[in-house]
Amino acid sequence: MKHVLSLVLLCIVSSAVAQKKILDHSDFDIWNRIQRQTMTSDGNFIMYSLQKGEKDSQLKIKDKNANLIFEHERSERGQFTYDSKFAVFIIKEWKDSILEMKRRKVKKNKMPMDTLGIYNLKNSALEKFAHIKSYKIPKKWSGFVAYTYDLAKKNAPKNLRKEKDS
């Protein structure tokens, strides 16, 4: 009787182990990672980037009650200003289009540049600035955002841009 009971128990345990699903590539495509989480200095808002496998990231801003306030595709490197009035972030181009351009060996100066997004937390207004190279905000002072942009792409007339590229 003891041997029969042991054999039945062994069969049940081995069948339970065999039912576990093995991870494959499709599971990694839907796997979410939270990156660069930050909180305002007054503690009323949190911001994080949600990365889904090899796809574009999403920037999400939530209030202290975990209600979604703002969500933007292709956004990353988000920061809050010191006075907790604005969220500043970079908007990237679609990863698929960038990979396609790299595959076609497009020159680096013809690749699309990033956009700076500034979201007003008080009145929910979004302002965008194109052709951004980088940006910085002060850690303990508010009211300023310093950014650099590509002057040639932003202000040059179209006929001058064509002459420079030739």
Predicted regions and their residues:
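Bacterial Sec-dependent N-terminal signal peptides
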Residues: M1-L23
